[in-house]
């Protein structure tokens, strides 16, 4: 976990439901933390840095190289480094979708040669970025997909959305309002996915798309709870801070 130099703002946000609220609205227990972050050369825009890594890390850390992160609709973009790190400027707004173009080469993270073909996005919230949270996004290869969904206990459904939540800080229980398949999570101190909804990373498979968003709730106080986007056949990556 990164060390954060906090300023003086720590405000609890009133709980709200998901009826009619827009994506990026705070959810129950959502708080605001402002950190003196390095905005680099982003000027009046917002700098986001983080990592894009292979779904499985149990055999050792492995980033996804040469993926392209781009602000949805055209704009700033950045290619990931060999360790999966990215760094780019995003619009100064409450939330931004970053569309990820997968690398053309096969993964260097798996024994079975395969590429990343799953449409994937990162949903970046300004309040999470400015809290100092570390964004960690994941994706899986075509070969890994069958293994992942065998563990889930149901096949991958392209008509439904996939949602990965990275919990930066204290591992917490995470839930969503939309119907979904059995959750998987990585417990603190491990890099092994297993059944559950509490950990440093939580996966909601085969989520009903519904209106195109769902309310994300984190046990206890957090930054980043609230509505998150859902897209059929697409993996959405979200990060929340749990101080």
Could you describe each region identified by the protein language model?
Residues 1, 13-42:
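Ser/Thr-rich, Pro/Gly/Ala-heavy low-complexity intrinsically disordered linkers and tails
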Residues 1-7:
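Bacterial N-terminal signal peptides that target proteins for export
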Residues 29-47, 132-161:
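Beta-strand-rich domain onsets/edges
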Residues 34-68, 164-176:
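Structural motif
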Residues 63, 68-91, 180-203:
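Short, acidic Ser/Thr/Gly-rich low-complexity loop/linker segments typical of extracellular
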Residues 76-154:
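Short, low-hydrophobicity acidic/polar segments
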Residues 85-105, 193-215, 219-221, 228-232:
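Short Pro-Gly-centered beta-turn/loop motif in secreted/extracellular proteins
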Residues 104-136, 208-210, 217-243:
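Structured interaction patches on ligand/partner-binding surfaces of diverse proteins
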């Amino acid at each position: 976990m990164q060390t954060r130099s906090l300023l003086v703002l720590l405000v609890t946000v009133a709980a709200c439901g998901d009826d009619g609220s827009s994506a990026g609205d705070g959810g129950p227990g959502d708080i605001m933390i402002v950190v003196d972050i390095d905005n680099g050369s982003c000027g009046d825009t917002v700098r986001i840095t983080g990592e894009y890594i292979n779904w499985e890390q149990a055999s050792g850390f492995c980033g996804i190289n040469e993926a392209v992160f781009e602000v949805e609709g055209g704009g700033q973009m950045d290619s990931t480094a060999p360790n999966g790190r990215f760094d780019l400027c995003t619009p100064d707004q409450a939330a931004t979708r970053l569309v990820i173009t997968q690398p053309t080469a096969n993964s260097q993270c798996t024994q079975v040669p395969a590429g990343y073909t799953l449409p994937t996005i990162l949903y970046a919230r300004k309040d999470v970025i400015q809290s100092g949270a570390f964004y960690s996004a994941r994706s899986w290869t075509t070969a890994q997909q069958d293994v992942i969904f065998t563990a889930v206990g149901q096949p991958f459904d392209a008509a439904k959305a996939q949602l990965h939540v990275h919990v930066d800080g204290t591992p917490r229980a995470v839930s969503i309002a939309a119907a979904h398949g059995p959750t998987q999570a990585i417990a603190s101190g491990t890099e092994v996915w297993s059944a559950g909804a509490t950990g440093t990373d939580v996966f909601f498979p085969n989520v009903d798309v519904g209106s195109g968003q769902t309310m994300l709730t984190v046990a206890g106080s957090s930054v980043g709870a609230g509505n998150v986007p859902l897209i059929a056949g697409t993996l959405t990556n979200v990060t929340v801070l749990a101080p």
